Design a protein with these regions (language model features):
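Divalent-metal coordination cores built from histidine and acidic residues
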Residues: 76-190, 194-202
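Divalent metal-coordination and catalytic microenvironments
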Residues: 15, 34, 56, 67, ...
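Short, glycine-/Ser/Thr-/acidic-enriched flexible segments
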Residues: 18, 23, 36, 43-44, ...
Length: 502
């Protein structure tokens, strides 16, 4: 199109345009009233209110982030600039069974927003309490109405969160202590069906061993969705199937049999119609090489002509790097000895120090930390073969000090710091020490004999003032690309907005 003058709000010129599966082309794109009105070479710019020269830049449809935890962030920053700046124009919220569809759900004794989010997302309870105080709705319809009133940046699609659905139907305590009655299960099915008709895009559930409550006396319990038996999940997903909606789920990580049984619910052959299912996550876990292969095998099996499923695991297109503050980290939750520290409130330094100083706890921690690292046995063999049970590999060389009161340790990996501590205590470090480092070693680290002693003392000395990072999955970018480009997997699991420090 050349020569023709047309009214254009925005003309983007000379961009490399990617659209669907088409070969990328260099062209102009004209936009009026928020809609593309023409594409082509050398569009006349005389009628354009704004012209952008995009030479050397890419122009593409907005990205769709299918796995976010922006539920609370939307209430504070509804524009979601951290996503829109990357070109994301649509997000899905209320993943992994947690969301705000039913409001604050307080019952006078328990505060579900605080209980469910504090440890899962590492958010201080005071912040969560303030968020819950400002919630004015109590039904799925009212929540959608509320979202419509926000100045949203991207489009927002909402799942109905199963943990909150259980709380709404069974009460908080009932949702984590018993199965639903027949009438309660029917009530959940009815509420889910009604929500899907309102515009909720599906149901989210969760079975990962990282998601625990922050509500006494139930800090040893996982979030409500994980107490659902198979028959409950089957009944609810049947409602999702009937309405052509989506089930977002996570697998029972430690049981291949339970995983296969659960995800056979996607089968059209067994259930008359495929259930659209998206699952977290197809990751190349550093501590267990089998899991990424299992994800691909599962995808091929469940989508095969034999099973006739509609099953897509989400693949993350980046390294899975986790930041932690002292012992406060999501990956600690599946290890009982580390979980005890996570059960304390974020602000409770004294509580964590008391645990870390208890002789029985010290014994248990050291046994956990050194498991598989010494003496031959099944644990040592599994570590050698890289098929361990936990996502966190407890390898000092893989853990990097990001922030620390002892400033010269920042940027070092924990193994280097440990070696330095031993060199100082054995008086064989060939460099001059600062007074502060020497005093720290003398007062806190002089009795360190092994790496378990060292880890315990790092947590005692610095608590949450010690920030560190580790890459738990997707270290090999070649494997990441293979997963991302697999036609049976979906780009996703960004976990945007999840885990405050991530």
């Amino acid at each position: 199109m050349t020569g023709k003058i047309q009214k254009i709000d925005m003309l983007i010129k000379n961009a490399k345009v990617f659209n669907n599966g088409e070969t990328a082309v260099i062209e102009d794109v004209a936009i009026t009233a928020g809609r593309i009105i023409s594409r082509g070479q050398q569009i006349n710019d005389q009628g354009a209110s704004r012209v952008i020269d995009a030479k050397g830049l890419w122009l593409m449809p907005g990205l769709f982030d299918i796995h976010t935890h922006y539920d609370l962030e939307l209430e504070i920053a509804p524009g979601l600039p951290e996503s829109t700046r990357h070109g994301t124009t649509s997000v899905v919220i209320a993943n992994c069974s947690l969301g705000l569809a039913f409001g604050a759900q307080r019952d006078g004794k328990f505060d579900p927003i605080v209980a469910c989010y504090a440890r899962v997302e590492n958010i201080p309870k005071s912040v969560l309490t303030h968020c819950a105080d400002n919630i004015s709705w109590s039904t799925p319809q009212a929540y959608l109405d509320h979202l419509d009133q926000l100045n949203l940046g991207p489009n927002v699609a909402v799942l109905l969160p199963h943990s909150m659905l259980r709380i709404e139907t069974m009460g908080f305590e009932g949702s984590i202590t018993r199965d639903p009655t027949h009438s309660e299960l029917q009530a959940m099915k009815d509420a889910l069906g009604d929500a899907l008709k309102l515009g909720y895009v599906g149901l989210s559930t969760d079975a990962l061993p990282f998601h625990y409550l922050a509500a006494q006396p139930h800090c040893d319990k996982t979030i409500p969705t994980q107490f659902a038996q198979y028959r409950e999940i089957k009944a609810l997903t049947e409602v999702v199937r009937e309405q052509g909606a989506t089930w977002q789920a996570t697998p029972p990580k430690d049981s291949v049999i339970d995983t296969l049984k659960t995800f056979m619910l996607t089968s059209g052959r067994l259930h008359g119609r495929p259930l659209r299912t998206t699952v977290v996550a197809a990751l190349d876990v550093a501590n267990n090489w089998k899991l990424s292969r299992l994800a691909k095998i599962l995808a091929r099996l469940l989508n095969s002509p034999l099973i006739q499923g509609d099953f897509h695991m989400q693949a993350l297109g980046a390294r899975f790097k986790i930041w932690s503050d002292g012992a406060i980290t999501p990956i600690a939750e599946e290890i009982p000895e580390l979980r005890r520290l996570n059960e304390t409130d974020l602000e409770d330094r004294a509580g964590r120090l008391s645990i870390l100083s208890d002789p029985d706890y010290i014994r248990d921690f050291k046994a956990m930390w050194l498991k598989g690292k010494h003496r031959w046995g099944i644990s040592r063999l599994k570590r050698k073969l890289n098929i361990e049970d936990y996502a966190f590999n407890r390898k000092l060389a893989d853990m990097t000090v990001e922030l620390c009161p002892q400033k010269n340790w920042q940027g070092m990996d924990f193994q280097s710091v440990f070696d330095r501590v031993l060199a100082i205590t054995n008086d064989c470090l060939n460099e001059e020490l600062s007074n502060t480092e020497q005093q720290l070693i003398n007062s806190d680290f002089s009795q360190v004999k092994d790496e378990a002693d060292f880890m315990l003392q790092m947590l005692r000395s610095f608590d949450t003032d010690l920030s560190w990072s580790t890459i738990t999955a997707n270290r090999d970018l070649k494997t990441v690309r293979e997963l991302l480009m697999d036609p049976l997997l979906l780009p996703g699991f960004n976990d945007s907005g999840a885990h405050l420090t991530n």
